[in-house]
């Protein structure tokens, strides 16, 4: 089962957890399953049109990946939200 590693402000939407084991065969599947388990996360990673939000990046094995990237059992998918300020 893939492991999702959450950073920064994303953690607050999953009860403060920084890592969660989630099923799925693509990054999109994994995020959909994660959102089903943690409804407060909906809209923070993927927008209403199903696109990755501009301030969020996904990484697998140190490489940036898209929502359509395959995710294998044992992979770690890092969801990283950018920090901004002024």
Positions of predicted regions on the chain:
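Ubiquitin-like/PB1-type beta-grasp interaction modules and other compact soluble beta-rich domains
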Residues: 1-85
